């Protein structure tokens, strides 16, 4: 059985869905992906998400559950609220930062999502709580 990086998988699925202007995307249901979806919804990057009833039986007999993320677009040209998503810390190369060294993304328009001892949070919240952690990804 292979281990997959659920964060990279989630971000890649969102990125690919944005390229074809899909309204929704299914990602693997874990506590981590649900927390990331909550942050993206709260910050206005996605419209909503729901825990899907759909399950998938893989070839090795593992049942996977999914969450459905509804993507957000604006205007008649259907421009996405998400311009770019960049994964920073990877399983082979972890990246950590103190709250003092956190920089704003895209001039404050974007945000950094961190994994801290207090759970997942944005860079703004980490700075106000004076907590550093692992930089998961940038989004703007």
From Swiss-Prot:
Query: What's in the GO CC field?
Result: chloroplast; ribonucleoprotein complex; ribosome
Q: Which PROSITE patterns match?
A: RIBOSOMAL_S8
What protein am I looking at? Small ribosomal subunit protein uS8c
Q: Which GO terms describe its biological process?
A: translation
Give the protein's biological function.
One of the primary rRNA binding proteins, it binds directly to 16S rRNA central domain where it helps coordinate assembly of the platform of the 30S subunit.
The record lists the organism as: Euglena gracilis
Q: Where in the cell is it found?
A: Plastid, Chloroplast
Q: Which UniProt key words apply to this protein?
A: Chloroplast, Plastid, Ribonucleoprotein, Ribosomal protein, RNA-binding, rRNA-binding
Q: Which InterPro entries match?
A: Ribosomal_uS8 (IPR000630), Ribosomal_uS8_CS (IPR047863), Ribosomal_uS8_sf (IPR035987)
Assembly and binders: Part of the 30S ribosomal subunit.
GO MF annotation terms: rRNA binding; structural constituent of ribosome
Task: Give the family per the record.
Answer: Belongs to the universal ribosomal protein uS8 family.
From the broadest rank down, the organism's phylogenetic lineage runs: Eukaryota, Discoba, Euglenozoa, Euglenida, Spirocuta
């Amino acid at each position: 059985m292979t281990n997959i990086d659920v964060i990279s998988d989630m971000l890649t699925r969102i990125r690919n869905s944005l390229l074809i202007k899909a309204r929704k995307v299914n990602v693997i249901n874990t506590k981590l992906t649900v927390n990331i979806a909550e942050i993206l919804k709260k910050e206005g990057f996605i419209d909503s998400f729901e825990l899907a009833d759909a399950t998938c039986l893989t070839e090795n007999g593992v049942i996977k559950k999914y969450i459905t993320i509804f993507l957000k677009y604006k205007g008649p040209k259907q421009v996405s609220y998400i311009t770019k998503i960049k994964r920073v810390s990877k399983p082979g190369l972890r990246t950590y930062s103190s709250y003092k060294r956190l920089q704003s993304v895209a001039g404050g328009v974007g945000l950094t999502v961190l994994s801290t001892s207090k759970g997942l949070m944005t860079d703004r919240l980490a700075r106000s709580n004076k907590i550093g952690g692992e930089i998961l990804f940038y989004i703007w």
